[in-house]
């Protein structure tokens, strides 16, 4: 659907060249929700602006449906932009227009007949749950309602692609969840390809099928959501994942670890999370199990959990228990000070 091929964007600043995007190669499949995460200045927003040619790449090509959009004429580019909807962190609504007027605006620009505009806007108002707010002005709406208007407006021209630029960053946690659920509904019912950028890993966790991590203009890691979360390769990705899955031992727990114990990280995936592996080794081997820390989350309907445990007992019995555990779960010995 969307392909970035060795794309770079270079800016000149104070006589120096700055790579906002550097040699990025990515593919976004039709109908998927693809997240791009990174800290401020990573190049996320620049990459999004390249998709609808608000910025042009310095090098490389960008294709949509196998067509190079960097070579489009002005007329072709105008048609392309009608296929791309966009929602923003700051909503970008017209304060002088009603909710109805804001949603109708892109349809008027496209010279859609009035009766069709009314029908389409009413359909979208119902879809985003704002049927009773058609004649309200933005100042009368909450942040979540404003973003619902933004989503409806972005959908007005029946686009194939929806770009989300930090769409939930200005919202409280409860409203963020509501908007993410609405975006999942958009993806599901309209089969829309969604490309979103964020600096919040919990947003990626809740909604994305695949994710790319950007740092200093480069994509440093990319893959399926489950793979990136459960096997993060770079330090930056590991830090993002830890904002959702905290696997560090608290100091208060570290202080309680008895001398001579051995600490292991047990990783459970899917059906493994329901297996009573610890009670089994406690019953069948002369080993005491001290659970130090643990968590479990759901990623794309698959459970993923971590446990940090201390095993105490004779070394021979511990080794037998470890041999059994390795057959059941992923197992790694950790140092107490590194946990």
Curated annotation (Swiss-Prot):
ATP binds at residues 38-45. It catalyses: L-methionine(out) + ATP + H2O = L-methionine(in) + ADP + phosphate + H(+); D-methionine(out) + ATP + H2O = D-methionine(in) + ADP + phosphate + H(+). Its EC number is 7.4.2.11. One of its GO terms (cellular component) is plasma membrane. PROSITE patterns: ABC_TRANSPORTER_1, ABC_TRANSPORTER_2, METN. One of its GO terms (molecular function) is ATP binding. Keywords: Amino-acid transport, ATP-binding, Cell membrane, Membrane, Nucleotide-binding, Translocase, Transport. SMART domains: AAA (SM00382), NIL (SM00930). This is Methionine import ATP-binding protein MetN 2. It comes from Bacillus cereus (strain ATCC 14579 / DSM 31 / CCUG 7414 / JCM 2152 / NBRC 15305 / NCIMB 9373 / NCTC 2599 / NRRL B-3711).
């Amino acid at each position: 659907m969307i392909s970035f091929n060795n794309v770079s964007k270079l800016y000149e600043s104070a006589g120096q060249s700055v790579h906002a995007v550097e040699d990025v190669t990515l593919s976004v499949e039709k109908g998927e929700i693809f997240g791009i995460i990174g800290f401020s200045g990573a190049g996320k927003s620049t990459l999004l602006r390249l998709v609808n040619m608000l910025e042009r790449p310095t090098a490389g090509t960008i294709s949509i449906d196998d067509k190079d959009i960097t070579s489009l004429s002005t007329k072709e580019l105008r048609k392309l932009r009608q296929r791309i909807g966009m929602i923003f962190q700051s909503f970008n609504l017209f304060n002088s227009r009603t909710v109805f007027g804001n949603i109708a605006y892109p349809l008027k620009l496209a010279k859609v007949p009035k009766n069709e505009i009314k029908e389409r806007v009413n359909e979208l108002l119902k879809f985003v749950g704002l049927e009773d707010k058609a004649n309200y002005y933005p100042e009368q709406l909450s942040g979540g309602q404003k973003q619902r208007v933004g989503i409806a407006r972005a959908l007005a021209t029946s686009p194939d692609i929806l770009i989300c630029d930090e769409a939930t960053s200005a919202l409280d946690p409860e409203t963020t969840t509501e908007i993410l659920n609405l975006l999942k509904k958009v993806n599901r019912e309209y089969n829309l390809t969604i490309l979103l950028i964020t600096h919040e890993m919990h947003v990626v966790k809740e909604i994305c099928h695949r994710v790319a991590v950007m740092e200093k203009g480069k994509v440093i890691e990319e893959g399926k959501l489950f793979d990136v979360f459960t096997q993060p390769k770079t330090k930056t990705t590991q830090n993002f994942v830890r904002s959702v899955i905290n696997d560090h031992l608290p100091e208060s727990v570290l202080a309680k670890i008895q001398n001579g114990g051995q600490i292991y990280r047990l990783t459970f995936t899917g059906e493994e999370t329901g297996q009573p592996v610890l009670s089994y080794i406690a019953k069948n081997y002369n080993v005491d199990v001290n659970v130090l820390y643990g968590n479990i989350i759901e990623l794309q309907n698959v459970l993923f959990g971590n446990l940090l445990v201390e095993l105490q007992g004779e070394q021979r019995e511990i080794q037998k228990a470890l041999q059994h555990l390795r057959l059941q779960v992923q197992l790694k010995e950790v140092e107490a000070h590194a946990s």
